[in-house]
């Protein structure tokens, strides 16, 4: 009979899961990712050692760096890793907290789904809670004077204490603050702080970490092109080019038929004259240094050397932009169009030093640099990479405070204050939504709880007394001292976090939880390529994504 035959809509190669199974699978995947980096929160955090596919070693406790290296299969786990990257790009800090918080938000929702509560009810309660969380955070935030150096250093320090670099915290804080203050650029009342482009971190293995410093200028890994050129110039006049000082060959292939010997000599002579003219155009401005992104021919080197001009070639475009910002030069594409105001005179010194086996060009003592280089020294590549990651976080924290000078207390204090506010508000609520709403308050406590666990103190006793403390008047700055596992007033301890980071953490965590709760069906198909081969070899689920 026809009626009993099953109707196949989806291809037989696809695998489909739906309903409760999907939701619990997503929640478990999110919890697993959160558990991986739970121990990386706070000053007593552990490090993770990861092997990348190329066989290199990554040692870090930075949430984003760990998750970047992990290969995952589950789609929900992939979206969790994605939020850590978003957090890192947006505010540069709080990558570990956002994953732990999102995992916990999903974990507390599981209980309601088991009781057959509809996901949309949970979602609307979460969204309501997010609005209240944001308003409570803004209430407990305090403004900060960005010109107060001591205060700025203590803010950066509270970000650094959770990292490897905490042993050299005062050095790192000063480096981060100086670097960010250098690249800060104000135009028409608009602040711009582009750390990625203009604050470059150069890592040179060798020496000790105490040798690290911020250069008021730029350092590039290049030597002069001719051994007889000057390597130490005070107040240099710098010309920056992005064209080559070589004979220009035509775009398309050209054939020249030469019948007489004089013609060949003339062609060579024309090449020489062309290069000579290029060099003359540059030399008439009397520069001390010519830096180009392209090549410099031997003949051009000879002319420049005779004019006592130092030349450096094949510099990266990004480095050239930084040099332009540091010494006030303008990058020129055609040497014949060079004018006096294209020459950079802002640098105080150009010198070439040998560090280890390599030569480095230092353009320092700039009058008003808008770009800088952070020179890092250390024992090994792994340590240097971790220190660089820590410094990037510190600089991002500094940038966030300069752009939005509002602070909230750290050490789990703001989480407890927000949780207390949500619990109080939920008492006045009616209907089924009050339970998921209250669960958000419970989920927020995961941050202080993890801090207590990571320093080996008694979780139940401390968390209960912290909860009791927050019910009292004007105690919203009390939190956990991650070093000792005791309760302290964060105002006295001086541990603050930028409001921008906290807001982004909460928004991202709740949005991700909401996104994953909305999923009730996962259809995973096979890849088209290699399907037949997989069937022949009998590889189980080889093409499955």
Swiss-Prot record:
GO molecular function: ATP binding; ATP hydrolysis activity; ATP-dependent protein folding chaperone; unfolded protein binding
GO biological process: binding of sperm to zona pellucida; chaperone mediated protein folding independent of cofactor; positive regulation of telomere maintenance via telomerase; protein stabilization
Catalytic activity: ATP + H2O = ADP + phosphate + H(+)
Keywords: Acetylation, ATP-binding, Chaperone, Cytoplasm, Disulfide bond, Hydrolase, Isopeptide bond, Magnesium, Metal-binding, Nucleotide-binding, Phosphoprotein, Ubl conjugation
Modified residues (Phosphoserine): 11, 170, 243-244, 252
Post-translational modification: The N-terminus is blocked.
Chain positions found as N6-acetyllysine: 222
Location relative to the cell: Cytoplasm
Residues recorded as bearing Phosphotyrosine in the entry: 247
Disulfide bridge partners, by residue number: 366-372
Keyword Repressor included in the entry's annotation: no
Family stated for the protein in its record: Belongs to the TCP-1 chaperonin family.
Function (record text): Component of the chaperonin-containing T-complex (TRiC), a molecular chaperone complex that assists the folding of actin, tubulin and other proteins upon ATP hydrolysis. The TRiC complex mediates the folding of WRAP53/TCAB1, thereby regulating telomere maintenance. As part of the TRiC complex may play a role in the assembly of BBSome, a complex involved in ciliogenesis regulating transports vesicles to the cilia.
Protein name: T-complex protein 1 subunit gamma
Organism: Mus musculus (Mouse)
Organism placement in taxonomy: Eukaryota, Metazoa, Chordata, Craniata, Vertebrata
């Amino acid at each position: 009979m026809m009626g009993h035959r099953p109707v196949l809509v989806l291809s037989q190669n696809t695998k489909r899961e739906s309903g409760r199974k999907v939701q619990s699978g997503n929640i478990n995947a999110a919890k697993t990712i959160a558990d991986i980096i739970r121990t990386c929160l706070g000053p007593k955090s552990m490090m993770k050692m990861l092997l990348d596919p190329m066989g290199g070693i990554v040692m870090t406790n930075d949430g984003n760096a760990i998750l970047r290296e992990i290969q995952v299969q589950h789609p929900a786990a992939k979206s969790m890793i994605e939020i850590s990257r978003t957090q890192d790009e947006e505010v540069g800090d709080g990558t570990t907290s956002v994953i732990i918080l999102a995992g916990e938000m999903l974990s507390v929702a599981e209980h309601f789904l088991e009781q057959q509560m509809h996901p949309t009810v949970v979602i609307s309660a979460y969204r309501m809670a997010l609005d209240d969380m944001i308003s409570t955070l803004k209430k407990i935030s305090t403004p900060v004077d960005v010109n107060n150096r001591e205060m700025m250093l203590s803010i950066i320090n509270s970000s650094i204490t959770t990292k490897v670099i905490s042993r050299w915290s005062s050095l790192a804080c000063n480096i981060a603050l100086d670097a960010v203050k250098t690249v800060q650029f104000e135009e028409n009342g608009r602040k711009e702080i582009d750390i990625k482009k203009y604050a470059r971190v150069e890592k040179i293995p060798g020496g000790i970490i105490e040798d690290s410093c911020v250069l008021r200028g730029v350092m590039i890994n290049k030597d002069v092109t001719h051994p007889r050129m000057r390597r130490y110039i005070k107040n240099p006049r710098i010309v920056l080019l992005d064209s080559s000082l070589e004979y220009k060959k035509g775009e398309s292939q050209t054939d020249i038929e030469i019948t007489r010997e004089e013609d060949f000599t003339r062609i060579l002579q024309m090449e020489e004259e062309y290069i000579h003219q290029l060099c003359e155009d540059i030399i008439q401005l009397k520069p001390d240094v010519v830096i180009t992104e392209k090549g410099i021919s031997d003949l051009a080197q000879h002319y420049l050397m005779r004019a006592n001009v130092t030349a450096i070639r094949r510099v990266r475009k990004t480095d050239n932009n930084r040099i332009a910002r540091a010494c006030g030069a303008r990058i020129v594409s055609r040497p014949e169009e060079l004018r006096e105001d294209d020459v950079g005179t802002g640098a105080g010194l150009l010198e070439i030093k040998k560090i280890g086996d390599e030569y480095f060009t230092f353009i320092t003592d700039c009058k008003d640099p808008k770009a800088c280089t952070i020179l890092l020294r250390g024992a090994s590549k792994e340590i240097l990479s971790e220190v660089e990651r820590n410094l990037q976080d510190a600089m991002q924290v500094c940038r966030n405070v300069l752009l939005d000078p509002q602070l909230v207390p750290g050490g789990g204090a703001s989480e407890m204050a927000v949780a207390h506010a949500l619990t109080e508000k939920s008492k006045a609520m009616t209907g089924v939504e009050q339970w998921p709403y209250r669960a958000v308050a419970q989920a927020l406590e995961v941050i202080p709880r993890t801090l207590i666990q990571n320093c080996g103190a008694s979780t139940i006793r401390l968390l209960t007394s912290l909860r009791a403390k927050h019910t009292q008047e004007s105690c919203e700055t009390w939190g956990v001292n991650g070093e000792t596992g005791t309760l302290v007033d964060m105002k006295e301890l001086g541990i603050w976090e930028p409001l921008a980071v906290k807001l982004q953490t909460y928004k991202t965590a709740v949005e991700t939880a909401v996104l994953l709760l909305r999923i009730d069906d996962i259809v995973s198909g096979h890849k088209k390529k290699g399907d037949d081969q997989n069937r022949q070899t009998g590889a189980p689920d080889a093409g499955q994504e």
